[in-house]
């Protein structure tokens, strides 16, 4: 689903019918928004104001908060953080290799976004004041919907009706646009955040697998329990980031391959 839906919607004269069909086939709930990056205009929306689990897509916002602290002079990407074995959680492919020497803040952000390293995310989350601190950052930049209440890996539980660690497609798209185009971050930090998304190494089975030659993509995926799956992406033809696409899926019995 997540691989084919954006391009199918883009090409379809009836994009909402395409989304409804996908939702029916998966027997779950799909939330999607396609937004013009330059203007912020909504191009396509389906369940865009309904809550969905963020899963690992929150890591982009987290690193945006870290970069805001860097811009303010309160953090440095070169600062080394040391941690212990007991700080590691499931799926930490990068951080587990650096117990002896630690990792810099910049390296942790790269690991969190490009490899979805969960321990890296938790270590970064601690630097911004935990889940409550990240939620406060979101409120400061005008996102009154998105909320983080838990750490990795509990935040991926995706319980029905649970508002914890959720967002809406519309809110996530608007927040991404603010981080990447407004003055919330310096131009240098915007370029860095976008580059980490360009360098994503765990999104191969999704949109990247069907993208036409010459298209730009920068993305971050997420996976959770109870059929939850998600992706946030910037993409466009002629190797230019023209639009933001956010897709979330929940409450489906579909396999991971089918969700992808």
From Swiss-Prot:
Q: Per UniProt, where does substrate bind?
A: 220-222
GO terms classed as biological process: beta-lactam antibiotic catabolic process; response to antibiotic
Under the heading Gene3D superfamilies, the entry gives: DD-peptidase/beta-lactamase superfamily
Entry's transmembrane regions: none
Enzyme Commission code(s) on record: 3.5.2.6
Keyword Hydrolase set for record: yes
Q: Which InterPro entries match?
A: Beta-lactam/transpept-like, Beta-lactam_cat, Beta-lactam_class-A, Beta-lactam_class-A_AS
Q: What is the annotated signal peptide range for this record?
A: 1-11
Listed Pfam families: Beta-lactamase2
The record's comment on protein family reads:
Belongs to the class-A beta-lactamase family.
Additional observations: The class A beta-lactamase family has a specific amino-acid numbering system, sometimes called Ambler or ABL numbering and often misspelt as Amber. A multiple sequence alignment was used to derive a consensus sequence and then the consensus was numbered taking into account insertions and deletions. This allows use of identical numbers, e.g. for active site residues, despite differences in protein length. UniProt always uses natural numbering of residues, hence there appear to be differences in numbering between this entry and some papers.
This protein's name: Beta-lactamase SHV-6
What organism is this sequence from?
Answer: Klebsiella pneumoniae
Q: What is the lineage of its organism?
A: Bacteria, Pseudomonadati, Pseudomonadota, Gammaproteobacteria, Enterobacterales
Q: Which gene encodes it?
A: bla
